[in-house]
Amino acid sequence: MLGDGKEGTSTIPGFNQIQFEGFYRFIDQGLIEEVSKFPKIEDIDQEIEFQLFVETYQLVEPLRKERDAVYESLTYSSELYVSAGLIWKTSRKMQEQRIFIGNIPLMNSLGTSIVNGIYRIVINQILQSPGIYYQSELDHNGISVYTGTIISDWGGRLELEIDKKARIWARVSRKQKISILVLSSAMGSNLREILENVCYPEIFLSFLTDKEKKKIGSKENAILEFYQQFSCVGGDPIFSESLCKELQKKFFHQRCELGRIGRRNINWRLNLTIPQNNIFLLPRDILAAADHLIGMKFGMGTLDDMNHLKNKRIRSVADLLQDQFGLALARLENVVKGTICGAIKHKLIPTPQNLVTATPLTTTYESFFGLHPLSQVLDRTNPLTQIVHGRKLSYLGPGGLTGRTANFRIRDIHPSHYGRICPIDTSEGINVGLIGSLAIHARIGDWGSLESPFYELFEKSKKARIRMLFLSPSQDEYYMIAAGNSLALNRGIQEEQAVPARYRQEFLTIAWEEVHLRSIFPFQYFSIGASLIPFIEHNDANRALMSSNMQRQAVPLSRSEKCIVGTGLERQVALDSGVPAIAEQEGKILYTDTKKIILSGNGDNTLGIPLIMYQRSNKNTCMHQKSQVRRGKCIKKGQILADGAATVGGELALGKNILVAYMPWEGYNFEDAVLISECLVYGDIYTSFHIRKYEIQTHVTTQGPERITKEIPHLEGHLLRNLDKNGIVMLGSWVETGDILVGKLTPQVAKESSYAPEDRLLRAILGIQVSTSKETCLKLPIGGRGRVIDVGWVQKKGGSSYNPEKIRVYISQKREIKVGDKVAGRHGNKGIISKILPRQDMPYLQDGRPVDMVFNPLGVPSRMNVGQIFECSLGLAGSLLDRHYRIAPFDERYEQEASRKLVFSELYEASKQTANPWVFEPEYPGKSRIFDGRTGDPFEQPVIIGKPYILKLIHQVDDKIHGRSSGHYALVTQQPLRGRSKQGGQRVGEMEVWALEGFGVAHILQEMLTYKSDHIRARQEVLGTTIVGGTIPKPEDAPESFRLLVRELRSLALDLNHFLVSEKNFQINRKEV
């Protein structure tokens, strides 16, 4: 980010910058740090020594391109070479070689990595920063108990607590605690040093009994006492080296390694001057912490707010990759030790190259990217989704919180989040508040803190010289920070104005001359998702949250369209997403087609730019680039060459501007349902393309290898019509549900005994040979119909059972909008399409145009997302005047009712220019009288009409609709399975049963709870009677779920039986359940 001398100018940082900086820091610093920690390895006789040299390492440029890595399901990585030396101590000779120690997955231009052909991204984690924190809690008597918690770099905790008698204890486990004197002595201090280094020696002496003196008489005694309490060991343990090692490993290593950040925090909190390279907890730290705790007890010092961002640190991509590199080197160390021992045992002469294998590093990174909770598959639904995913911040993950243990205070917005973490953008559900999003201008500092930029105002002029500062959360408490920018203050004389400001986590109104810093940008506090919502200041925050989440679910449409009303950030989002093709140098277009653009560069060299053609994203949306330049045109560096999915002219374009009326229509927009015109279907307004991938593998079985073939016995020729001579579906074929995509036969042993006797007799009469293979073809599942656009046959070298051949078939589907699809605006106004009306039946305007969509007006007042009304009316004015608007939020800071004035003035101008008085009617501005398409009569009340930007979301009915006639049943309850993927059934739950009971439909209810559910015999009889014909017999015994309940009660020693009462003589007939 740059700040020049001009008033309030700045450039928005690259949205992928956080990821790039993290990866660069890992390559530049993290690798060297970890290699320098690699120990010298010696053999048992200490004759040979192996070591790695940190000065020189080399990353080789990848051999394969990104696209090839994705297509072939390989990892886009670079080979790492390090210098290693082998020293023979007897002859003092050294052999040095450059050795290959493994592959490191590289980051591409999108800030993501490609592992096994899948785009993956590492998200940043928020952890409690290592250091010391003071808190107080009320005990059962209502007395404040003060504690000091030391958190290590590994997340281990050591608690110091002070009791009523001012004695200080260190809690070593949940139940055990030891005196602070014993802990200090065990760490190497004697009593004299302890008393010299504390501020309150008399308090320490007050609880020094004879027993205590004996415990701290020597270091050995203190360690034994500490070990007894820590390990809960009875008797008298004997001091030994192994006992010290156990304590070191289980206690000191986990709870006393502070790290670089922890040392800095403890020095700052306790006013110590211990060198930064001393990353372990020292007796001086413990004693200073105890002094501070005594001060707290007597009312001195302040308690810590654990949720303040100054007490948090960001574990970035660099830290996670460095941790994994250290883990891989530890594994490599064990391998080298084993190899040296083996070489000496077999009397072989080792070389550095022979001792090292690339497996530990390569497998460590592959398992990290594949299994670690913070490494996620990149969501590529649309360009916005790709960018936002890399800017997530998570409290979850290893060393962090879980969705069930995190309390409300952690999830809540904190004043220190201002300008660093977006107060709006978070996930809904159990993880609300635990997964956040970085604010636009926030960056990660050197110490793992989140920094936000501000303009510094100098005392003399308050505006002449402006300098940009990045402040960490611990720094900005000391400044008065004005929330507005100078434009908002220019309405009057600045010196006389009171401005809203922030000081010490409070929001105040202060005089302009008292301000030290001011904000640099109206969007500074929001994430990218929230910054794309126009008029966000008029919306309730809950709806803004939904909107920022739903924009990430928008499907790229076949013909994208820019929004009329936007915020100005659309261009930056599109450019940083990497979806449009951008010229890397200036030149002249020599050739262009759908697959590539050829550009002449400096001199005679030409540059070929390949375009993405119908590429599948991991959400099955279609990624496609369309050339925007003509042959012979001269272009400049940075110019848009081709638009991608959901971008137009280099701007983000997720939806469509369509004509909308807010009115009820025959109950079809009840409860957020949406009524649409058939024009949206036939005009392909909301048509999108989806690409599905189907894959099959061939294995080598015990009976022999599987075969790909077109000759499949027992199958109709109709199903095999699209296969070529190899048995694979042909490119361009139209395929329907059930068609064979790849023909495959699996060998099986033919056993005569497995057939029924009459089957064997028939085979003998007709001379039919017993089949030696069974058909295991790849068939197109339900809902998969479409056009085959690509077929890939991936053959690994040396095709074994471990390296099977893979055949992939890609099928493109064209999906128009239909009943059951989900649409949404940019203000959290979402709905399901309930009916598609003929255009002649839709309500129409005074100029005869039918509206495209009808929303329910009751969805606005209760949800308080009034921004949609402003956008709707301004969109109508923009479409009539052929204008586009880019509006920054919080425009009311410049003038009262600024948004309303802008909208009404634009509507008035549109009314004048188009000579349509109905566009702006002074009695009800923004509303208009419209007519019923069925009768031609005007509606009773004027209705608000406009052109908002409406998105089609990825929750589509084609992916959700599902039916079942019969299928699999659960083994225990004998009820149908749940879910579409398992061909499951519908559950008739408690409330559904009540609804049916309310209508008295006893027979339907009985069917649903027996034949259609878990009555095994009745199920079979129903099948028989429906085939043969006849009446369905009534089930007499209980269904399986009732029998399961009886068995579960019996396991609790409760026996349950039921009785049948005779209708004639009311005799009880006992019958066993």
UniProtKB/Swiss-Prot annotation:
Catalytic activity, as annotated: RNA(n) + a ribonucleoside 5'-triphosphate = RNA(n+1) + diphosphate
Superkingdom as given in the UniProt entry: Eukaryota
Record key words, sorted: Chloroplast, DNA-directed RNA polymerase, Nucleotidyltransferase, Plastid, Transcription, Transferase
Cellular location(s): Plastid, Chloroplast
Gene Ontology MF terms in the entry: DNA binding; DNA-directed RNA polymerase activity; ribonucleoside binding
GO CC list: chloroplast; DNA-directed RNA polymerase complex; mitochondrion
Classification via SUPFAM superfamilies: beta and beta-prime subunits of DNA dependent RNA-polymerase
Record-linked Pfam families: RNA_pol_Rpb2_2 (PF04561), RNA_pol_Rpb2_3 (PF04565), RNA_pol_Rpb2_6 (PF00562), RNA_pol_Rpb2_7 (PF04560)
Annotated GO biological process: DNA-templated transcription
EC numbers on record: 2.7.7.6
Function (record text): DNA-dependent RNA polymerase catalyzes the transcription of DNA into RNA using the four ribonucleoside triphosphates as substrates.
NCBIfam families, sorted: PRK00405.1
Family: Belongs to the RNA polymerase beta chain family.
Assembly mode: In plastids the minimal PEP RNA polymerase catalytic core is composed of four subunits: alpha, beta, beta', and beta''. When a (nuclear-encoded) sigma factor is associated with the core the holoenzyme is formed, which can initiate transcription.
Protein name: DNA-directed RNA polymerase subunit beta
